[in-house]
């Protein structure tokens, strides 16, 4: 799992960031390890970000993935649906506010409505652990160092994101994140860049020179010294 953190500074492009966050709902219904499921938003743009996410969710049509217009398909099994729903319920029990979703769609299949939980804190189970479903949690920060602290407060570190109005600032934040990959003002990975995680998100790298080395054999020849 990744439990990806997405940091938003006060001068970021909110629409661009929300477009990236919404991929959690639509891209494999959140069943992807690089999903930006933990939103860490500057307090000055918190309300606008939550409102924009709510408005965006209204376009996330749930249904058969083979049908035109469907943006959110089912999760893989009934067991996994129940697991994701338990994460949502734990967030509610811990005091999170359900902005959208939180309920099971009235249709056959293993569907979960795109869910947005606001008012979250880093001690909540739904914030700390990987639900692996269409669930986004939002926390606020009061500055870059606080945002970095919240982002790094995780057992995982696969893919993180920074949306900022200043490129130098974005790079400075990225270099302090305990994450194997960081994307700046985008959610798209670079296919030539090494891919892998820190902490419980794994060891080793795929892609790039590092990925090729993983498929190579290393021979050591020893001689008397």
Model regions and ranges:
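ALDH superfamily catalytic-core signature
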Residues: 1-121, 184
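Conserved C-terminal structural/oligomerization subdomain of aldehyde/semialdehyde dehydrogenase
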Residues: 6-7, 12, 61, 88, ...
């Amino acid at each position: 799992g990744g439990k990806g953190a997405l940091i938003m500074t006060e001068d970021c492009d909110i629409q661009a960031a929300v477009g990236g966050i919404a991929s959690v709902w639509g891209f494999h219904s959140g069943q992807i390890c690089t999903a930006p499921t933990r939103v860490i938003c500057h307090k000055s743009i918190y309300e606008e970000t939550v409102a924009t996410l709510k408005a965006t969710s209204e376009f996330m049509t749930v249904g058969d993935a083979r049908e035109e217009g469907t943006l959110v398909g089912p999760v893989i099994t009934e067991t996994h649906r129940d697991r994701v729903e338990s994460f949502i319920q734990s967030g509610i029990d811990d005091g999170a506010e359900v902005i959208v979703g939180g309920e099971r769609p009235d249709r056959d299949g293993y569907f979960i409505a795109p869910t947005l939980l606001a008012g979250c804190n880093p001690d909540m189970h739904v914030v700390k652990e990987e639900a692996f479903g269409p669930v986004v949690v939002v926390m606020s920060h009061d500055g870059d160092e606080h945002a970095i602290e919240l982002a790094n407060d995780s057992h995982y570190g696969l893919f993180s994101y920074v949306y900022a109005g200043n490129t130098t600032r974005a790079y400075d934040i990225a270099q302090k994140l305990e994450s194997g990959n960081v994307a700046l003002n985008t959610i798209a990975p670079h296919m030539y860049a090494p891919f892998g995680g820190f902490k419980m998100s794994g060891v080793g790298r795929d892609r790039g020179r590092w990925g090729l080395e993983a498929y190579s054999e290393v021979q050591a020849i020893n001689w008397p010294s």
